[in-house]
């Protein structure tokens, strides 16, 4: 039986502080939060058969949620009065109209807003932001993972720098090979799990570096 519902980072917070909590931003992606009003949605809880008592307490990302438990402090060798926050603001994307791009396995683009909005095409997702406002998020499923796939699975190398050395400044924007980075389907803006990747513009004289450049630019653009 389910005792409590929490996200992975919330479990770490719980082990540190003993507090069952999450932040509004992460809760926005659980499909159980009324993002506009920043509270758990009774409608969604009823649909999913989830009791609100099993859900974590909600905090703004910057708010302290507690201090270390005696056990955690002893294990980590830290003072017990160390303050633990729900999350952190590290990219400076606070206040309306700020943009942040985060690239990892997938790639996300965040645009902050002072007001709540819903994209009727469902290409962007609305989340609560750390400053009490909101942000719209677009996500591509394959970002830096495309470079990893190309280098390691196709070229059989982990020397990324060597592969990118031939891509000099004069070649940027001048490549005639294009790469569609849909290796795992796509979310924003297509929401199409059947989307597939492709190289376009290949010729007999297409050099290896042009393909590497196409992979990088395909993700970037």
Regions found by a protein language model. Give the residues of each.
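Active-site core segments that coordinate phosphate-bearing ligands/cofactors
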Residues: 1-22, 31-42, 46-49, 64-221
């Amino acid at each position: 039986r389910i005792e409590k519902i929490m996200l992975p980072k919330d479990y770490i917070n719980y082990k540190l502080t003993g507090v069952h909590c999450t932040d509004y931003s992460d809760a926005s992606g659980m499909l159980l939060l009324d993002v506009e009003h920043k509270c758990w949605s009774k409608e969604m809880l009823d649909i999913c058969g989830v009791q609100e008592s099993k859900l974590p307490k909600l905090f703004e990302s910057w708010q302290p949620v507690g201090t270390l438990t005696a056990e955690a402090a002893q294990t980590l060798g830290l003072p017990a009065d160390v303050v633990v926050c729900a999350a952190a603001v590290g990219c400076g994307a606070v206040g309306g109209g700020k943009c942040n791009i985060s690239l990892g396995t997938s790639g996300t683009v965040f645009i902050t807003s002072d007001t709540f909005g819903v994209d009727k095409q469902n290409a962007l997702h609305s989340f609560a932001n750390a400053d009490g406002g909101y942000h719209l998020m677009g996500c591509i499923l394959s970002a830096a993972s495309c470079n990893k796939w190309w280098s390691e699975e196709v070229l059989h190398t982990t020397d990324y720098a060597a592969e990118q050395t031939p891509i000099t400044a004069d070649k940027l924007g001048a490549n005639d090979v294009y790469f569609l980075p849909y290796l795992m389907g796509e979310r924003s803006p297509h929401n199409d799990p059947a989307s597939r990747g492709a190289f376009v513009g290949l010729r007999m004289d297409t050099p290896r570096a042009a393909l590497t450049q196409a992979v990088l630019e395909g993700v970037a653009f």
